């Protein structure tokens, strides 16, 4: 009788662990593991500089948004972006060296508060990207989304390469 109870408890613990591990969500700690690094910047490009007028909101580049920036920028990143569903946003601006204040390539890493919020927000983001498929790419995994876009279609190959690197990093986590 005791052996049966012990076996049942072990099975129950295993099932609980399996279910909880399959629904683990990402937190801001994943950002540093997947974000673009200075070594990955294409030749002739650099991290962009934040212009003076924007420094009160965007403190530096690359930068993890504070809550004020999330509230002000969510709907500017993609139409209908809902800041209450986003826990973290990391932004990397890459620009041509000839124009250090430009935003030729931008990578946003968004961490949503839960998978339901991620699903609803990704629907909006994917719809937006579908209208800009020659200039934007998204990657989604659980409650995380990576959104890369370029101003000029000639730079699309750069974000394609960056997205492949980010995708590989996500798969290795």
Identify the residue ranges that each predicted region occupies.
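Mid-chain, structured segments of secreted extracytoplasmic proteins
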Residues: 72-106, 110-114
């Amino acid at each position: 009788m005791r052996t049966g109870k012990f076996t049942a408890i072990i099975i129950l613990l295993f099932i609980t662990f399996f279910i909880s591990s399959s629904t683990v969500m990402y937190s801001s700690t994943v950002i540093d593991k997947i974000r673009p690094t200075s070594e990955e910047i294409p030749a002739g490009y650099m991290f962009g500089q934040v212009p003076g007028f924007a420094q009160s909101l965007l403190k530096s580049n690359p930068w993890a948004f504070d809550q004020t920036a999330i509230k002000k920028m969510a709907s500017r990143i993609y139409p209908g972006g809902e800041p209450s569903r986003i826990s973290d946003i990391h932004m990397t601006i890459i620009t041509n060296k000839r124009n250090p204040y430009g935003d030729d390539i931008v990578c946003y890493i968004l961490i949503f508060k839960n998978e339901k919020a991620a699903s609803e927000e990704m629907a909006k983001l994917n719809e937006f990207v579908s209208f800009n498929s020659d200039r934007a790419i998204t990657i989604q995994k659980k409650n995380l989304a990576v959104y890369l876009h370029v101003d000029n279609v000639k730079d699309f190959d750069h974000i394609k390469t960056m997205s492949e690197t980010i995708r590989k990093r996500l798969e290795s986590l």
